[in-house]
Swiss-Prot record:
It comes from the Bacteria. GO terms for molecular function: DNA binding; structural constituent of chromatin. One of its GO terms (cellular component) is cytosol. This protein is one of the two subunits of integration host factor, a specific DNA-binding protein that functions in genetic recombination as well as in transcriptional and translational control. This is Integration host factor subunit beta. CDD domains: IHF_B. HAMAP family: IHF_beta. SMART domains: BHL (SM00411). Belongs to the bacterial histone-like protein family.
Length: 98
């Protein structure tokens, strides 16, 4: 599902909201999650999962095209850990509850 599809689904499920308002809400949620991660904060959505950042140490990598060894700098990457309820829904194929 793309962000556009998510917005369309949410707008269809909530006809009392304008599509542009739903788009603004979704964009605000993504922006706030991104800002929190940029600050190094943890974002926990109960029943869904938690977003955190993890540090990847510097290492020596290999260019797959040339085989040349290259230095890969240390970096911070976003990480998502699914919550118990989300894992159970995915494993059981159960639709989301309203």
């Amino acid at each position: 599902m793309t962000k556009s599809e998510l917005i369309a689904e949410l707008a269809a499920a909530n006809p009392h909201l304008l599509s542009r308002d739903v788009e603004l809400i979704v964009q605000t949620i993504f922006s706030e999650i991104s800002a929190a991660l940029a600050r190094g904060d943890r974002v926990e959505l109960r029943g869904f999962g938690a977003f955190t950042v993890k540090k990847r140490d510097a290492r020596t990598g290999r260019n797959p095209r040339t085989g040349e060894m290259v230095a890969v700098d240390e970096k911070v990457v976003p990480f998502f850990k699914a919550g118990k309820e989300l894992r159970e829904r995915v494993n059981n194929g159960a639709p989301a509850e309203d």
